[in-house]
Amino acid sequence: MKKYAINREFFPWNLFAPPISKKFLAMSVPHMKPPKSLWRDKELDVTTHKITSYDGEKITCFVMSSKKLSTKTPCLIYLHGGGFVLEAAGYHYGNAMRYAKEVGCKVVFPLYRLAPQHPFPTFFEDCYAAFCWAYDHAEELH
């Protein structure tokens, strides 16, 4: 019996997945930092929060909002992707900044822990902790 029962029709899609090695990850990390423009944008308020995940570890969460907001607004939790192995890239931060400024919502941007250093389900639990934190702080996020 195989480890996972995967339908054979999906096997060709495996050819589109690039190999990710520890060397590739190590080379990419220096380029995956929050851009300085995040704190220099005159139209944006950015606050940093340390939130507690399921195992007691603290993760960083940025909250971005337009300085033009004056009424209650929705909140978007932005999970950057990266297959849960790559940190957020500059364009992820750019997307979140645009949501905050152009859509007029608060953006919660968690820096969840990544594989392979933190195995499943750590990254999912960190994302859920960010959701719970946003829910618990809904009044101040409005």
What kind of feature is each model-predicted range?
Residues 1-66:
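A glycine/proline-hinged amphipathic helix-loop "lid/cap" segment
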Residues 72-83:
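Short beta-strand element of the alpha/beta-hydrolase
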Residues 80, 86-87, 91:
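Conserved AMP-binding/adenylate-forming
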Residues 75, 104-108, 113:
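A fold-wide structural signal in alpha/beta-hydrolase
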Residues 47-49, 77, 108:
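Hydrophobic/aromatic beta-strand patches that form the interior of the parallel beta-sheet core
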Residues 88-89, 95-96, 109-142:
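Catalytic nucleophile-loop/oxyanion-hole region of alpha/beta-hydrolase
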Residues 65, 93-98:
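Short, charged beta->alpha transition segments
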